[in-house]
Amino acid sequence: MKFTDAGEVVEMTIDHLYVAGWTGRNKEAVDHHIAELAALGIAPPSQVPLYYRVSNALLTQSPMIEVLGDGTSGEVEPLLIQKHGDIWIGLASDHTDRQLEAHSVAASKQICPKPVAQELWKYDEIKEDLDALILRCLIQESGEWVTYQQGSLANIRPLA
């Protein structure tokens, strides 16, 4: 995949892809989310946080993705890539099939493409300011762009 870092093209081969779930810093908020999902029939995680191995072929930089049915949604997430001892940070979406999630969270993570942004930053250059970064996901509803999800990295566990 081709990314940019400060205007320079950086080519990355992604050999392994993991999706982290249940990563909130606030234990009470994580427990509340687990309870909300349990009410929808989704089994609680075996541990917190929980890491899911998914196919690296799911990564895409396409501006459009195709999914099966209308029961999917994205979640804006930080993307970490390690190459030759360096770590880069970017944006990704853990697009998930919410209906399948009630049967298997692991399968729900594996069935949808994972869009990733093209811009990366070297982790060491921004690590002191990570908690101030705001991740925002916009969706189009009735022809208008609206905020679907927004939060700072201060809401999740430290990345490294």
Language-model regions, residue ranges each:
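Catalytic-core "active-site belt" of small-molecule-metabolizing enzymes
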Residues: M1-A160
